[in-house]
Amino acid sequence: MKINLNKTHVVQAVSLAGITIIFAGTAQAQELLTKPDWLPQLSLGVSETYDDNIFGVSGNGMTPQEAWITRISPGIGFDFAPLLGSQAPFQTLSLNYTPDFVFFALPRDKAPYNEPSQDYDAHKFGLALKGSAGDFSFSLSNSFLYNDGSRAAPTYALNQLPSSNPLANQFDKYRSQFANTPPRERANQFQDREATLLQYDVDKFFIRATSALLYYGMNTVFHTNKAPYMGYQNYPSRDDVNGGTDLGYRVLTNVALTLGYRYGSQYQQQFPASIASDRHYSSSTYQQVLFGAEGRPWHWLEMKLAGGPDFRDYNPNTPVHDLHPTRYYGEAAVAATITTNQSLAFKYKQWNWVASTGYVPEFDSSYALNYHWNATRQLGFDLAAQIQEADYTSGYDAAGTAPSIRADREYTLAPGITYAFTPQLSVSLSYAFNAGNNELYTIPATSHPAYKNFIDQMVSLGLIYKF
């Protein structure tokens, strides 16, 4: 991997100088600039992060690679609803652009050979529409990303020696699912997330039409699993699209019980025959019946819960024991205002998804808890904790860059502190501890389960100015 210290230091110096100038001229800027109502967001942020393991390796083979990461984050957002007047059906009609320009500097290049550059420019666009007309209400949200990163994926292998050589070591290919996530997110790709709702209310009842999209269009090149590409990560494109209807009944003024139905399709790109002889892939269609509850049972608590059976139909080339299983889907979002200056938020999701590198579909679980405390008007504390799990035990495929029968888990703990010098300028300091762990203890020694365990720590210092 190319060391880009000079370029990064220039970017750091220019960014920090710009923030300093803004800080020095805060009073003058406040007098000269008053944002119109249709410009709710105008900001500039810069952060510096030290990451001690950017590829999430165990250290048994490849040495963990450290890096200094500089992130420049301007942001601008428009809301055109105020221009339409109070009689218009729109409460929100917003568009924003919040890019990140990210530069990696490696103090010592510990890669066993040349890895691709990890620098990237994340061009992020957001669209939000919300309104009502009579008994109808509607909303649309869309988050689109073009990530201008490397078109070459990383290679998880200490060397490219043939297996007959006693020094051969490509065991890092058995890395955790969660070790591979950060470098994959830095690669060249498109992402799109969309959610649309249209609701009609009649007395205590309502009917709601929904649609949702999750799309990953990967632009990285494919390579065979042969030298010099043993351990190279081939990233297939993936998507999930679904639509359906919810029926709701308000058992209390602000609480409703719901019954929903979804029909959806998941797509996983099949690797070309010239790249992989294994012709498996895990595209499927599914139907879900969801039981839920939503609303505010008390003024300090807001919730939205849904869960139920997932009836899955996999394509005939899916490497699973049952092509028509009944699985589970569940999600929850709960937010509590504990006191006037403390809040707690919990998010949960379990669902069936397709693999980002392999063939076997995964059962994906995520539990996230976030606590926030405004100690004073200027000083705030945050504490976040998360557990994620990727379970691939429904499959039988032992081919590919690594056997697919596995269950990986990641634990995250992330405290942070924020101090606001002014309503416009604030500084933040945060720490994140990530621990990956193998959760399938029946994995044979030949699959080197110890290579799935890793620790990754990050420390970040950031400044942001909001005009």
Kindly give the residue locations of the regions a language model identified.
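Gram-negative and organellar
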Residues: 29-467
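Gram-negative bacterial Sec-dependent N-terminal signal peptides
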Residues: 2-28
